[in-house]
Amino acid sequence: MTLRIYNTLTKQKEEFKPINEGEVRMYVCGPTVYDYPHLGHARTYIAFDVIRRYLEHKGYSVLMVMNFTDIDDKIIRRAKETGEDPAKLAEKFIKVFLEDMKALKVKPADIYPRVTEHIEDIIQFIERLKEKGYAYEGSDGVYFEVQKFKEYGKLSGVKLEELRKGARVEPGEGKKNPEDFALWKKAKPGEPKWESPWGEGRPGWHIECSVMSSKYLGESFDIHGGGNDLIFPHHENEIAQSEACFGHEWVHYWLHTGFVMVKGEKMSKSLGNFVTVRELLQRYSPEVIRFFVLQKHYRSPLDYSEEGLQHAKNNLERLYNTLENIRIAMENAELAYTWDENDFKAYNSIKEARRKFYEAMDDDFNTAEALKAVFEVSNAINKYITEAEKPKESVLRKAWEFFRTVGEIFGIFEEYFKEEKAKEEEKLIELLIQVRAELRKERKFELADKIREELRKLGIQLEDKGKETIWKRIKV
């Protein structure tokens, strides 16, 4: 099956073809770290977590980068309000963010670059833009001259003439045109600052992501993602400055998540209608929150309500009940020497639902449709267990493996399969102990010691007691 992705840049679904076969380089805009993450943030990071998991499931090697904006107007403003040092404030909320994402079972990015650790890279990028004639120095900083980038607006659809209507350059601003945006801001009293060719100051917001993404993913990469609210001006400005600098197409696929809505309004800090991840986790499990998010396509608005979360909880419990029914049935199931009509019917239902699941996921990661297929399997296998005179282990195993796959992609059912995984690990350890014992009998001590050392690196310690070897888990 061919994976098709909706590209915000072209406003249509396109066949996904990475730049390098078998490899996906992906950048997701991370948080500005000045407060606790809320459900609106979590929705975006859960969505991209599932996208990443599905790409990996399809066999791609994914390199994922997510930045931390650890210096920004919002951070400076909050630090002044609380009397904290901006750097310490940012560090505190980086820790909070990482803890919250771990709690939500969001896999860590491969690289988490911070703005404050890439100041020199940012300065060099701005100098390249100046050399190419796209940037100029004003009285209060360095600006990108938007009108010089002829494709400005190709992501968001905004027109320069519309931006200029009613806009004006305020007195004291150093930019030539209202639409120009800051690449470097000259220092104001009491603000964090760094040395640069244009005097002390700090980076503008948009330049940060262009610099950090291209440093780790190259001057062209596959996927750039974030929330809908970043399409303009942030991502539009990123494209302008990056393609002006590099002289070619920068990102191939732009993906954006829909808003979380509360009574018809976007969930946001400014409106005060938000619920933090930590507040949600006091009432619901991480898997319920993930399930709630995945019931909607990632580009669609997601309506937040307690009723919606409770509905997600009930639906997830239904699937857990199905897993338990399968587990119990497998303990008493027969090996299949022949199949009857019920066996074929259940097997074909699972096979068709599995096809629908992958068809939905290949259609722009449509988790909402994919979940319908999951419930089709749930209904079919429960019916089979109830009606079949003697359920066959092979049919039950097909459903079991399907649920395991869904769990790995969606980040759910983890607790259920954890016990089974532990049993499989124990069998493998016991097998290695037997192999090691045979090697010792044959006086191949070097290989026997190699097994012991490799297991120790994995947190398994072997202890020889006479003719017996026991093992225990240790911290590594």
From Swiss-Prot:
Keywords: Aminoacyl-tRNA synthetase, ATP-binding, Cytoplasm, Ligase, Metal-binding, Nucleotide-binding, Protein biosynthesis, Zinc
Taxonomic lineage from the root: Archaea, Methanobacteriati, Methanobacteriota, Thermococci, Thermococcales
Name of the protein in question: Cysteine--tRNA ligase
GO molecular function, one term: zinc ion binding
Biological process per Gene Ontology, one example term: cysteinyl-tRNA aminoacylation
NCBIfam families reported in the protein's UniProt record: cysS
Broad class of the protein's primary localization: cytoplasm
Amino-acid positions noted as binding Zn(2+) in the UniProt annotation, renumbered to this chain: C29, C209, H234, E238
Keyword Protein biosynthesis (UniProt): yes
EC number(s) stated in the UniProt entry for this protein: 6.1.1.16
Motif ('HIGH' region): 31-41
Main EC class the enzyme belongs to: ligase
Motif position, 'KMSKS' region: 266-270
Reactions this protein catalyses: tRNA(Cys) + L-cysteine + ATP = L-cysteinyl-tRNA(Cys) + AMP + diphosphate
Cellular component GO terms, alphabetical: cytoplasm
Annotated positions binding ATP: K269
